[in-house]
Amino acid sequence: MEAAADLRDTALLTLKFKFNPRLGIDNPVLSLAEDQDQSDPWNLHRPRFCLLSKEEEKTFGFHLQQHLGKADHVVCRVDPGTSAQRQGLREGDRILAVNNNIVAHEDHAVVVRYIRASGPRVLLTVLAQHVHDVARVLQGSDAFLCPTLPSGVRPRLCHVVKDEGGFGFSVTHGSRGPFWLVLSAGGAAERAGVPPGARLLEVNGASVEKLTYNQLNRKLWQSGDQVTLLVAGLEVEEQCHQLGMPLAAPLAEGWALPAKPRCLNIEKGPEGFGFLLREEKGLDGRLGQFLWDVDPGLPADKAGMKAGDRLVAVAGESVDGLGHEETVSRIRAQGSCVSLIVVDPEADRFFSMVRLSPLLFLENTEIAAPPLAETKDLPVEDTVEPSGLAGSCQCFLYPGPGGGYGFRLCCVASGPCLFISQVTPGGSTARAGLQVGDTVLEVNGYPVGGDSELDRLQQLTEAEPPLCLKLGARNPQGLEAWISLESGEDWTLASELL
């Protein structure tokens, strides 16, 4: 009986809503606007920030495409169980910025370069497809859609070396993070660039936001005589809070870092470049490309190459995740003058520890632009054969480490065929000698033509390699005319896996 009475009493407390036809539905309980959680990453009506990381995986777990003639950089697929899925990236999202760099009007290759250069962590600013299309019409430009930090307002990566006064900071006492730093005037931390009152985000590449005070002290003690801190000053913390942007490590600028990448511009001599590229496991346990057997007096040695250097980029493009053969192809594609970015073992150890790419910390380094010409050295597995048709040829392609063949197709509704609109230097397509403007007649033995074939082409290209293409004669004049048409639709055989 007492239980029944309690139930009746509770029922009397239930609020009731009476519909008023003159006022319409004005029930506060049904107000969706008030119930929206502005910190919810699934709130698709505004730009979202996705901080992705490569832990055990080799990639972030999403595929990127761009339509020719449009400024859209579209997430066309998100792999299940990856960082991209866990952080809320969705199929159809438009990428507005990479690490605070607005990419709305950048070329597709530039966006891919930004993401790959970010290394094991990247911050993407994205917007849902339907919201992006409406907002672009209303705003007239993607730049107004993308919230960014002002110039000079960044988290800082500071390397602090202990002196007679210690590290020169104390930590605000609390049972658990977040923590803020109190600096000693003229101390080691202040000299290393730590701003006063900074929030402590990471110690030696590991987040301390959820550590207890005792755990943090133990971590600092284990650092020995030097420690690398990721911190955010008061202005940075305030700006990120206003934008809803995470205090992310890929946004950081380096202060007093113990190591940095080096750019080597090497011109081939009569005896070659004078070094050997070898694939082996690095300090992080992952395969990488390392430089050995640097011959004294030859161009590589004169440019400053040291045995044991790790190759980070070729012509400014990251080689992280590339296999040995593809890396060699990219170097050969440079011809007689190559631009390499390298790190020595000490720098490699440092950037592996902080889990950031050395390419984020290049200082006033001139990087030679990648050439447009493809290499003439063709590996055995990517070949071109004459075809029975006059003016046509047949080629067999194998996908690279990222799953792509290194080219993009374009079709126009009013056009009679498909043609190659872009070739990635160093990719299997470039190695096979294909060029922009080549028309595609057959794929894996099936004739193609026009935009009605895209669904079938997608199925064909998902089949087991090699990919067999029959190509017609090159038509650069027709290519230029087709690209200028607004009815043109771009289609990618294999999107970039990032």
Swiss-Prot record:
Keywords: Cell membrane, Cytoplasm, Membrane, Phosphoprotein, Repeat. It comes from the Eukaryota. Its main location: membrane. GO terms for cellular component: apical part of cell; brush border; cytoplasm; membrane; plasma membrane. Expressed in kidney and small intestine. Not detected in heart, brain, spleen, lung, liver, skeletal muscle or testis. It holds the Pfam family PDZ_6. The keyword RNA-binding does not apply. One of its GO terms (molecular function) is guanylate cyclase inhibitor activity. Residues 49-130, 157-235, 263-346, 394-475 form the PDZ domain. It is a peripheral membrane protein. It is found in: Cell membrane; Cytoplasm. Induction: Isoform 2: Expressed in a circadian manner in the intestine. Phosphorylation at Ser-329 negatively regulates its interaction with SLC26A3. The keyword Plastid does not apply. InterPro entries: NHER, PDZ, PDZ_6, PDZ_sf. The modification Phosphoserine is found at S329. Interacts with the C-terminal region of GUCY2C. Interacts with C-terminal region of SLC9A3 and the interactions decrease in response to elevated calcium ion levels. Interacts with the C-terminal region of SLC34A1. Interacts with USP2 isoform 2. Interacts (via the third PDZ domain) with SLC26A3 (via PDZ-binding motif). This interaction leads to decreased expression of SLC26A3 on the cell membrane resulting in its reduced exchanger activity. Acts as a regulatory protein that associates with GUCY2C and negatively modulates its heat-stable enterotoxin-mediated activation. Stimulates SLC9A3 activity in the presence of elevated calcium ions. This is Na(+)/H(+) exchange regulatory cofactor NHE-RF4. The lineage of its organism: Eukaryota, Metazoa, Chordata, Craniata, Vertebrata. The gene is Nherf4.
